[in-house]
Amino acid sequence: MMEERAAAAVASAASSCRPLGSGTAPNPTAAAPASSPAPGPGPVGKGGGGGGSPGPTAGPEPLSLPGILHFIQHEWARFEAEKARWEAERAELQAQVAFLQGERKGQENLKTDLVRRIKMLEYALKQERAKYHKLKFGTDLNQGEKKTDLSEQVSNGPVESVTLENSPLVWKEGRQLLRQYLEEVGYTDTILDMRSKRVRSLLGRSLELNGAGEPVEGAPRASPGPGGLSGGESLLVKQIEEQIKRNAAGKDGKERLGGSVLEQIPFLQNCEDEDSDEDDELDSVQHKKQRVRLPSKALVPEMEDEDEEDDSEDAINEFDFLGSGEDGEGSPDPRRCTSEGNPHELESRRVKLQGILADLRDVDGLPPKVTVPPPGTPQPRPHEGSFGFSSDVFIMDTIGGGEVSLGDLADLTVTNDNDLSCDLSDSKDAFKKTWNPKFTLRSHYDGIRSLAFHHSQSALLTASEDGTLKLWNLQKAVTAKKNAALDVEPIHAFRAHRGPVLAVTMGSNSEYCYSGGADARIHSWKIPDLNMDPYDGYDPSVLSHVLEGHGDAVWGLAFSPTSQRLASCSADGTVRIWDPSSSGPSCLCTFPMDGEHGIPTSVAFTSTEPAHVVASFRSGDTVLYDLEAGSALLTLESRGSSGPAQINQVVSHPSQPLTITAHDDRGIRFLDNRTGKSVHSMVAHLDAVTCLAVDPNGVFLMSGSHDCSLRLWSLDNKTCVQEITAHRKKHEEAIHAVACHPSKALIASAGADALAKVFV
């Protein structure tokens, strides 16, 4: 439409610049400052475009090409703005629809998963019950037990029967079994709809039923209030008041009053029943097995018999809606017939349902139940009101909708609180990380003394007493045997030491590694490609250079990526700091010069202060050194109350000023680098603690000992969370080294049995 109007305007301007008629576009110059109406008797009439003579005053201004272009631009801008607004609204609505669809799909998936899980748990519960029955009675639950007790009935004299058919547990099992079969044939949702429909119809006609029902003999007729009983809540209150008045008139009014109120509000009893634990359930099973002697004459039913009869009637009434599903709301309610019609109808329904349950048990393999007709005619239930139906089934349905909107979840059972608390504790334990062996490294010929992980790849470097270092690519694992740990072959062997290799550490970015041995030398190695062929020729460029200066075996190495410095401790009694990247003399400083603390055993850089290094000694001392000052800064209190014990390894916490030491006296001590005080001390193993490693996040500590065990400790509460037996003893030695991967969920251990193991 806009294009037609613009074309008409251009045509009229090109022809004779006639005034704007009624059939043309509005004057674009109307937006000019002189926007007031033109002087004259009035605006242009309807006949302005039909050839009528103009008025005595001047007409509208003639059209011009700039005005037409301005009008077109204005209309185009308005159209684009509306289009953008429409697109934004459309995108917003599409996003909302997509969000709602995704939420609905997620809820359906969650419901399906929960149903599957609960079905699995119910199946496991059935298996456990069968196992318990076999352990207690020595026989399996089979169909051969169905007629075991039928021959024991005696026709003359008192009758013996097993009270199995009326117990709440039996009816509960029957309900669950019938619900399962109904769900398999696809009647679950339909049945729930019918039940909700009938509940609404009953509540809607409550006033009519109250007026039509016959009053109970001996009880006053209840007259409706001024407002009538319009809701389910008023109906329930009215029914409870009538029942209290009826029960108060009898002999045992006080006893029956309490029972009647509880029966009238059955969900209180259900809560107690659901909260019973497994021991109570087992007691009820034993109670069902007890034989009760019934005299030939009819007895007054006790409270327990009434409860059992109530449960049986509830079970029958539970399935009354199956027959009323086709009739709809207008079908007669079987519950009304029990009190207004034939009194034997309840008995016939109960016998019919027991026959159905017996047939289903033949198919499902459930234990048989003995059916004995009750003595005498069943009495009317004391808690049935004048309406003729029981409220046991419908009370929970009227509260918040009940089962109406549950769908597939309607047939699920609820566990008691004790089982729930156990499940919560078990779920907490399930979240704890459990380390399991994944790789076994078998290529060394003697004990492995040290380990070092690659910083970013799944690779491990081992140093052994056989004089070699070996590089392992853990991504190239092969399975040697079925159900066995994966074996890994080394991709490269480093050979240059003249004697056992005692220490190894990774350099910056894992491009270089450094090893120290019994030959008093420190070798710098270039890490080869992890995807190299293990059978390639020897590459002499792998050995970078040698750091010399120590006079005895090098027992410990540590590298600081921050300061690019290498620290070493030797049996000659010194700790040296090296610059491994220097081409000239690379030893920067040496301490202690006097050897007052003895022979160092381990060295480590502190994580919080890169310019500080901590060293441990055989004398049990732990000294903190300042690299900038080149002197001892602080002596930590690492000696225990029982006397000095050799420290085998010292490590630093990755995020706190904390030093951790492993001692020969089976202890682990935590020391504060700021004060030098001992923060915590504990006995960690059954033998000497030989090695330590802290994970990069500072959550747990791993320790190894000569008692052949690895233990993982929580650094929050200093408790052991896992113990692993991974190595065997050799010459009274077991585990020599442990390590944690800097960036992956891998830990490793090495021992005197020439094996290294990796855990995930």
UniProtKB/Swiss-Prot annotation:
Record field: compositional bias (Acidic residues): 272-283, 302-317
Gene Ontology biological-process entries: negative regulation of hippo signaling; regulation of modification of postsynaptic structure
Residue positions, PTM Phosphoserine: 53, 206, 223, 276
Biased composition (Basic and acidic residues): 332-346
Residue spans of the WD repeats: 443-482, 496-535, 549-588, 595-635, 642-681, 684-723, 730-759
Membrane topology reported for the UniProt record: Peripheral membrane protein
Region (Disordered): 1-65, 210-233, 272-346
Subunit structure: Part of the core of STRIPAK complexes composed of PP2A catalytic and scaffolding subunits, the striatins (PP2A regulatory subunits), the striatin-associated proteins MOB4, STRIP1 and STRIP2, PDCD10 and members of the STE20 kinases, such as STK24 and STK26. Interacts with CTTNBP2NL.
Chief site of localization: cytoplasm
Compartments where found: Cytoplasm; Membrane; Cell projection, Dendritic spine
Protein name: Striatin-4
Coiled-coil blocks: 69-136
Region (Calmodulin-binding): 165-182
GO cellular component, one term: GABA-ergic synapse
Source organism per UniProt: Mus musculus
